[in-house]
């Protein structure tokens, strides 16, 4: 039997734990009042169980089905002749002024890295349900130049990759570095984009990648120039295969 002293000690411990929990709940409610958690699309307040996007906006996302034909779709056709193409997939259809562009803009320019992780987790769950989990050994993101990453504070593609990594249960690794600072790809022709990123990426020194099956991720696939340049560095470094996945691609 426990002595009165032990019982009293347990009571004090429980009481302190309870008071601490109440304080944490108070401060959380206070912070939610001052800095409310809102859905980045509809701006409505999020419920406790909603991580980043509200349930309604999740249901309205322009989801693509490239993963149903990963070897033969409009994305693989776009990259034919640039690299040895395996699977090329994307979570969302991109449309100008649409939800996908809105999310990408807020992810990249409005300091909302959590959007990338949430989209990665969502897409990872979709891929897991469709039997993709055992296809890759590692998830790798197209890196930003250190100067650009320091200015933004994070790499949006890395956040997407880490979300995918968690849902698929495979490691995330920074296998690539961007050794040259390049101009933005926006408003460049396809040839100009290819030239702009030529020999931009290289492997992290001393990191073995021989025979690895890599899922290379980026935020958006337009001409595919950046992804192809990064994939080439991985393949030349010894990767067994490189599949490509992006948050958004194509048009609608």
What spans do the regions from the language model cover?
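Glycine-rich phosphate/pyrophosphate-handling loop used in enzymes and phosphotransfer proteins
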Residues: 1-218, 222-252
